[in-house]
Amino acid sequence: MARDKTRMKRKERKNIAAGVAHVNSSFNNTKILISDVQGNAISWSSAGTMGFKGSRKSTPYAAQMAAEDAAKKAQEHGMKTIEVEVQGPGSGRESALRALAAAGLNITSIRDVTPMAHNGCRPPKRRRV
């Protein structure tokens, strides 16, 4: 029996000039999602997808590389200006911001959208190293 030829859907080139960069920086990893203003994803990258493993994912350099990769993919779709939403306490926040600016994207605003508990759940116990 002959196999049916499956057609791969080609990525169409969207022409989106403005968007939002969501930088999610945890203690273990940094994820960058660039979406349009409505929230539809255009490009994304993370320290893990850039080839960093283990504790190297949480470094500022890994966040910088991930941000450069996401910005390059977004610029292929015509992205020029972005708003940045930063979430989380990780070490990759600042370096991801700098990398997005250095990649040629015009940053119009920076918002910190880290959720703050109003005395919610009990935090994890202190580490004893």
Swiss-Prot record:
Gene Ontology process terms (BP): translation
A GO molecular-function descriptor: rRNA binding
One of the Pfam families matching this protein, by short name: Ribosomal_S11
Q: Which Gene3D superfamilies match?
A: Ribosomal protein S11 (3.30.420.80)
Give the UniProt family note. Answer: Belongs to the universal ribosomal protein uS11 family.
Keywords in alphabetical order? Ribonucleoprotein, Ribosomal protein, RNA-binding, rRNA-binding
Briefly state the protein's biological role.
Located on the platform of the 30S subunit, it bridges several disparate RNA helices of the 16S rRNA. Forms part of the Shine-Dalgarno cleft in the 70S ribosome.
Keyword rRNA-binding annotated: yes
UniProt key word rRNA-binding: yes
Q: Name one GO cellular component term.
A: ribosome
Name it. Answer: Small ribosomal subunit protein uS11
